[in-house]
Amino acid sequence: MKHYESYFYSTRDRDTRHAASAILDAVFPLLPRVSSVADVGCGVGVWLSVLREKGVETLQGFDGFWVEDGQLEIPVEMLKRVDLEQPLQWPVRYDLLLSLEVAEHLPPERAAGFVEDLTKASDYVLFSAAIPRQGGYHHVNERWQSFWAGLFAGRGYSPVDCVRPRFWNDDSIPCWYSQNMLLYVKDGAPLKHPPVYPMPLDVVHPAAYLGKVNHPDFRYGLSLAKRAILHKYFGKPF
């Protein structure tokens, strides 16, 4: 799994803190008491720092060796450096596990094992991963939400759509969270007030779509295709 450069974190983290607070406020009321949380692929620890502000007692982050100590939003001892491409070992289980926009960075052959690792650590997994053509730095395994749901189902976990419907029209939340994030709950685990109106699993957020079709590279490609068609069928200069 390749690392992010320092500028990536400094830019993205400003957009993440508000989203983390709002989303956690929506998820926590559904769960039994949350006193321990782990974040797999935590980056510089923005979500963990928000959890700390909310009074969660036990917090643990997991990410690679490329995350610099000086960038961290959490105490250094709260981060355990691991290779996410290898099986993860859990000394304890957690009340809630996070893995947000991480799985798409891991090789396709790691997908099933990664989900297995997550489910070994908690009955509740808040998960999001990039969909096909979402784009991003070193995305090597972009999959539809239903792909991941199938892997979780194989481990006895079902998706609870408590984030996407609530924040779909909220422009202050990054669209990849509103598009991709699902709470996976172990079958039989207690859940308060489950959402009544879940969305289809495989969806594309309008903001993500517009970001693609308005990108200069996409528009240039369309112009080339148009010129090629006019040249082939109408003899116009290419």
Language-model segment annotations:
Residues 1-98, 109-121, 135, 139-151, ...:
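Conserved N-terminal segment of class I S-adenosyl-L-methionine
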Residues 102:
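Hydrophobic adenine-recognition pocket in adenosine-nucleotide-binding enzymes
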Residues 105-106:
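A short His-aromatic
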Residues 122-132:
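Conserved beta-strand signature within the Rossmann-like core of class I S-adenosyl-L-methionine
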